[in-house]
Amino acid sequence: MKRDVRILLLGEAQVGKTSLILSLVGEEFPEEVPPRAEEITIPADVTPEKVPTHIVDYSEAEQTAEELQDEIQKASVVCVVYDVSEETTVEKIRTKWIPLVNGGTRRGPRVPIILVGNKSDLRPGGSMEAVLPIMSQFPEIETCVECSAKNLKNISELFYYAQKAVLHPTAPLYDPEAKQLRPACAQALTRIFRLSDQDMDQALSDQELNAFQTCCFGHPLAPQALEDVKLVVSRNVAGGVQDDRLTLDGFLFLNTLFIQRGRHETTWTILRRFGYSDSLELTPDYLFPALHVPPGCSAELNHHGYQFAQRMLEKHDQDRDGALSPAELESLFSVFPGPPWGPQLPRHRPHRGRSAAPARVPLPVDPGDLLGRPALSRAPWLPGLPHPLRAGLAGARHHSHQGEEAGPGKGQTQRNVLLCKVLGARGVGKSSFLRAFLGRGLGDARGPPEEPSVYAIDTVRVGGQEKYLILCEVAADSLLTAEADASCDVACLMFDSSDPGSFALCASVYKRHYMDGQIPCLFISSKADLPEGLSPPGLSPSEFCRRHRLPAPTLFSCAGPAEPSTAVFARLATMATFPHLVHGELHTTSFWLRVALGAVGAAVAAILSFSLYRVLVKSR
């Protein structure tokens, strides 16, 4: 909505433009009227719409044509004033003033126009019959107001309607020639209807209508008012009310009726409450809510956010199988202005779930959102949510102080979402590793083979706490450039034990990106069921890890009838959670011993602190 309104008064000489302005300001008819009034600014706190309003007069005797065009360009709305007792001034509206304001062209945005019939005290019958054909001819005319500067009749109403034409314009909402909502308006209202239809039965119950009413206007409808609304709809629209509930057709009819009766501010209130701008597009503030993350901190969804996401999944999971099919996903995202994830994410994302049907995925969540990295600040999946729930979800994102001011790898992380990059040469088994994370073997490759799964997400328990671990498959050769992004919470460097060259590639990536950093790394020897190949020149994998003070390579295989071991995934999550315990370790036992000792040390410290507290209390 515009932050200020600039009203320009035009019209023939002696029609009363200046008198109207002075009567508004002085609240009395001026005995002496100057040729032109100075520009007047009405403060925001004394206007009904709470916006500052500038009122500008025009005098053909004092201003040039160039000055007039400049004022028209700056005007938010133009009031064309005519004398109801002089028919020639009415005709000038059509032949002179409207073409002058909007250039006589039908292209581009048009300045809204208010027709003002002044001196109604001289013609009691009014002039509406003469003006109606003009209003029908020019759609930019918002309304016509008859008034009298002498009797102070409808003076305040005149400037109120001028404000309203700017702040709540009719043109984007309604086509007066077709007498129906414009497509963009109907589309926006349809989206709002779907968001308000919480039980997804294609109709708004009394409870949903009152929730919608409270969301938009701050209070519910009285029971009788609610019945009156449904009665009006049922009398005018076939199928507008079904089973005592308002359908989409009925909802659209109500808004059309508001506009036709001059109450388009009601429809604008609804649209703006759900994030729409004057051009009927979702505003940047709605699409990209501000999220400030202080240095040394990250942001994650708290349990309220996860509960909300779970409720959305359950709401759209029509067959109650614990997963969303493509059709159910389409239903969920039908109210979104665009895809909730970027092009880097596949269309089918594997995830452990109850459903065993192909091409079924859970409620998608962008790893960037979960991790609180830059993608989180863009909040790409918030725009489609209904306003009250959207606000609740935005509030569920909280700042989590990690004590990691020096970056990943320093101290224990308190985050619940961890990113592991699985790096390795093509063919070493990265995709199988991701499938094994989800409990799938080699014979259970879901999804089209031409669309490999880049991400896999599941929960892992670390020290009795549940963590979300995201595995991201990355081709190792893509990280051989210095500018490549290798950042993560833990790196999984995978090589084929039967292919010496695959280990050499992993070793190169380690030296380039991780050797001098603090990110914990774990080498994994895949296809451990196959015979080892020839030893590569130089250090063996075990010697390489010992030389660089890394944990010994972990053997992994997806072959065999049994599900692959999941211990390696718990280990990766633990390394990401306790990165300071990983570096300098030469074997697995030492690492897990430190984890255990850390937990025991914390418990001992707590007991000693409590004992000291009891001694101090007794001494008092």
From Swiss-Prot:
Topology class, membrane: Single-pass type IV membrane protein
Cytoplasmic compartment residues: 1-594
Crosslink site: Glycyl lysine isopeptide (Lys-Gly) (interchain with G-Cter in ubiquitin): 96, 119, 164
TM helices/strands, residue ranges: 595-617
Pfam family, one: Ras
Domain of life the protein comes from: Eukaryota
Binding-site list for Ca(2+) 2: 317, 319, 321, 328
UniProt-annotated binding residues for GTP 1: 16-19, 59, 118-119, 121, 149-150
GO biological process annotation, one example: mitochondrion transport along microtubule
CC per GO annotation: mitochondrial outer membrane
Residue ranges of domain EF-hand in the record: 184-219, 304-339
Keywords: Calcium, GTP-binding, Hydrolase, Isopeptide bond, Magnesium, Membrane, Metal-binding, Mitochondrion, Mitochondrion outer membrane, Nucleotide-binding, Repeat, Transmembrane, Transmembrane helix, Ubl conjugation
Region (Disordered): 340-364
Amino-acid positions noted as binding Mg(2+) 1 in the UniProt annotation, renumbered to this chain: 18, 35, 57
Location in the cell: Mitochondrion outer membrane
Ligand binding (Ca(2+) 1): 197, 199, 201, 208
Binding site for GTP 2: 427, 429-431, 527, 529, 558
Listed GO MF terms: calcium ion binding; GTP binding; GTPase activity
Task performed by this protein: Atypical mitochondrial nucleoside-triphosphatase (NTPase) involved in mitochondrial trafficking. Probably involved in control of anterograde transport of mitochondria and their subcellular distribution. Can hydrolyze GTP, ATP and UTP.
Domain notes: The Miro 2 domain is necessary for efficient ubiquitination by PRKN.
Assembly mode: Homodimer. Interacts with the kinesin-binding proteins TRAK1/OIP106 and TRAK2/GRIF1, forming a link between mitochondria and the trafficking apparatus of the microtubules. Interacts with ARMCX3. Found in a complex with KIF5B, OGT, RHOT1 and TRAK1.
Name of the featured protein: Mitochondrial Rho GTPase 2
Name of the gene encoding the protein in the UniProt record: RHOT2
